[in-house]
């Protein structure tokens, strides 16, 4: 906070004073994806130029160019003008470059600057910056030294600055002090309000690259009706039929055939949401873009030319993707994609082999994935551990509307279940029955899905909790819509576990149909919808209504890093019509529409981990248990580890919030905070705005819960459902994404094939080779961490706030996370906890806070991939 003593003694009486400063910035071409190749050759380039061929590479040239090209003006926090806004100092230009500064990061340049300042100007609290060059730069920080009676004042900027003529208002940055609106120094109030107004924009026109405007729109850019009916997709958001969270507005022109759909193309995101990275290996998001632009067409050409069959003939064929690789015609592929992409795809220069890293799930055992124990374990310790539910009644019932879908109650009978001596009633009473239930999600779509190449079931899986703490699958129900129509209900068959003969193959296939449901639900709902999509409205609302000076802005923004950018790329390349998800996952063109149906039942408050576990019937409240919850599956790695992380986040949020809100009455008058929450609910999640479960944000407790849910969702929940994708799904036999035929019927050639070879029957049923290559290419990228990742408990700048109490609380949070990581490592070494390793011997590390690379561990602050 500013210390504001009397005027006398602040600065030299009656005279000027030079305030020394250091400006740290990064040149555009250091951060530009297309310039990475030049950087690796040592061609740093200058700051003046058009496009990427910038001029000059020496420090002398750089200093000369900057000489009169970047001007700063200090703004007083204590001395207002007649209009009430703080006085503004003279234009001051950057001086010489600092060749050596210990705190500089890679690619950063530091410059001296000296401001003229006197007593009548008071204490600096903000500054203007004007860039007169034709090329933008990334402004990291300004540090003022030896400010009289203040010492050091820091400005953490982290923002792209374009030519000043492109802005309607001069760019402004505030010191790293923290104020709720009512405590803002009077001289800064006008600047604070003006900056928020600039970030909100006027909701008109097409957004340009340099814009910093945050606004809302519906998902009306996933399809392209101009390319034909097959490329049209329903608009998600803005209707009760297809509700959806809002995404960032781009203002692009509508398509010709549908004025309500937006033309696909390069997607605008507010400029500071796309800040760039330092190493080519960090351009993970752009790897996805390359997949869509180059790799997909290349794979399609290979299979169209019949260079390689679209089927695997044995399980070893699948393992060869990771062991020897498969040969592909580089002479064909190189005509479709650039050479650097070819080299990255083939891993080794000159080697015409596509080879994927060995996924963790087969590194110890090649066949343990096939066991019933592993099949069940991955429901509590795999990549989608947040769906399994406690079974409350038997037989399971459906929530589908019987006036539309008829009778959908399960056909599983009690006498069919092997419950280790328990009756169904006894197992229910002792809370030992659980279910993985995808019946209601898939049944409304199965008829449409099965009219395509794909053939699938809506599945229910019943599991029994054994005395040793592991789960045993005891029945799988495979359901289809009735041939006579939906009103006739479901046609179901119940498959029971078997160890020998054709029945064991049928059981293996039944598990595959379940995993196909699970893979699709995971990618579209657990991952995309419940983390990526639901967070974007909060990012938009935060930037529109919480000033950079606001304590909650400082708390939340690290958890938004890169999310709007990766979501925009997903709309371009992953979830778009005929994109990667539609090509490789079962629901195809219905994929994202299915997530809209699930969003109808999304509840913000249920995203809190304790509330989620209780709602799913896998935990009950127990004041005597850790975190006030008793897990009904005691060895539930995701829940056990997640509750530790959740509690640490909540404690940190409570301690931080208490620094700025002493009483509930402090929350209600905070105009920025109230407007932020009102808009996040009413616009960002507008299709659900009338739901009674939204917190009213009238108390400190509500504020803490809201912020904890946002941070949990963006960090730990996303880590839990994302970074295990390749470790578990990189072996397609373990997590197939599609099924192409139903269970063979007796008397058919397919049935005879199933009798003779369980491997061929399995391979002809699940994901094809083409789909496998696409899927593995994507999830390998999605499962990686960038080398400049910022993990939970870390900040990219140690001076993110000047508040020493906040810094101490944050240090405490970081220390707690280190303790938790050590505790979780000990649990993984506990031989009595079978679900932490399982038959595949893959320890549960997805909620270990730190990591890098393709490691199946690490919690980034944000949804950055």
From Swiss-Prot:
Ranges in a coiled coil: none
CDD domains: PLAT_LH2
GO cellular component: cytoplasm
Record-linked InterPro entries: LipOase, LipOase_C, LipOase_C_sf, LipOase_CS, LipOase_Fe_BS, LipOase_plant, Lipoxy_PLAT/LH2, Lipoxygenase_dom_3
Main subcellular localisation: cytoplasm
Note on how the cofactor is bound: Binds 1 Fe cation per subunit. Iron is tightly bound.
Subcellular localization, as worded in the UniProt entry: Cytoplasm
Domain (Lipoxygenase): residue spans on this chain: 178-865
Molecular function terms from GO: linoleate 9S-lipoxygenase activity; metal ion binding; oxidoreductase activity, acting on single donors with incorporation of molecular oxygen, incorporation of two atoms of oxygen
Domain PLAT residue range list: 50-175
SUPFAM superfamilies: Lipase/lipooxygenase domain (PLAT/LH2 domain), Lipoxigenase
Pathway: Lipid metabolism; oxylipin biosynthesis
Residues engaged in binding Fe cation: 527, 532, 718, 722, 865
Region annotated Disordered, chain positions: 234-265
Name this protein carries in UniProt: Seed linoleate 9S-lipoxygenase-2
Species name: Glycine max (Soybean)
Lineage of origin: Eukaryota, Viridiplantae, Streptophyta, Embryophyta, Tracheophyta
